[in-house]
Amino acid sequence: KKNKRSGKVENVGYLDLEQDEEQSRCSLYFYGDIVSATWESMWYEEDRCPQDIADFLNQLDGYEDIDIYFNSGGGDVFAGLAIYNQLKRYDGHKVGYVDGMAASIASVIMFACDELHFATGAQAMIHKPLCMAYGNADDFKAVIKQLNLCEDSILDVYMEHVQEGVTRDKIQSLMSNETWFDSKKMQQYFNVEIEEKAAVAACASDFFEKYNNIPEALKGIDTKDIVDAVIAELENRNNAAAEAEKQRIEAEKQQILDDLYLYGM
């Protein structure tokens, strides 16, 4: 994307970015896991961290509308809350599309959108935040306190988007039971629009093994095939880049030879 301040074309935080100059709209994709640091998101191009989103938003004018697409199995809860707040503060109109899945913290991020569309067959999942910890009893008490605070923050987000009559206790119960929603069930509890289109291909996530009630349709995903396809695509990109660089060098060599010939050398 061309940076409107510097005029340079830049890689915007490893994000897939499309821009419609006439309508002043951009597209942002969450098609991988939510991670805490840039070095983690560099391992897999589809993963996202808060700094990626900051880089993305910093290159917009602050009023451009954003279409945000979701097919994510979730990830780091603090990174996800940071991304939610970044997007929530952004002044442009944000339209969210759950194409395949918005699980765990990804289901929080999607509610940063001003309007939300749910594809027929798409899935969402809400649950209590979880973590790994070690230490003494005091350390674990501190972790429990932090998890409860996170749960309250997540509940606050969900409650801003529930249907009339849905109580906080009900959403908290659904979180405790790790509840998966199809598009129809999602609309029973939350203010979302259902789109008459099929969900996209299955999402590969490192966080599936941490969930308890994964729908049968998701259990059969062969993530190895997906990883192999991603690796093959990256290799193709690297080969294409290497070939382009080779052609550039050859062109420069030819230009030098032509200049030497022009001056009789």
Identify the residue ranges that each predicted region occupies.
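N-terminal organellar transit peptides
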Residues: K1-I105, C113-M265
